[in-house]
Amino acid sequence: AKTIAYDEEARRGLERGLNSLADAVKVT
């Protein structure tokens, strides 16, 4: 269960990073 929770957190972090990256590209 710990691995699954960590995986979900990592996935969320990745999505957040991609979103911020896309936002930065849009702004630029």
UniProtKB/Swiss-Prot annotation:
The keyword Chaperone applies. GO terms for cellular component: cytoplasm. Keywords: ATP-binding, Chaperone, Cytoplasm, Isomerase, Nucleotide-binding. Its EC number is 5.6.1.7. GO terms for molecular function: ATP binding; isomerase activity. Coiled coil: none annotated. It catalyses: ATP + H2O + a folded polypeptide = ADP + phosphate + an unfolded polypeptide. It is found in: Cytoplasm. Belongs to the chaperonin (HSP60) family. Forms a cylinder of 14 subunits composed of two heptameric rings stacked back-to-back. Interacts with the co-chaperonin GroES. Together with its co-chaperonin GroES, plays an essential role in assisting protein folding. The GroEL-GroES system forms a nano-cage that allows encapsulation of the non-native substrate proteins and provides a physical environment optimized to promote and accelerate protein folding. This is Chaperonin GroEL.
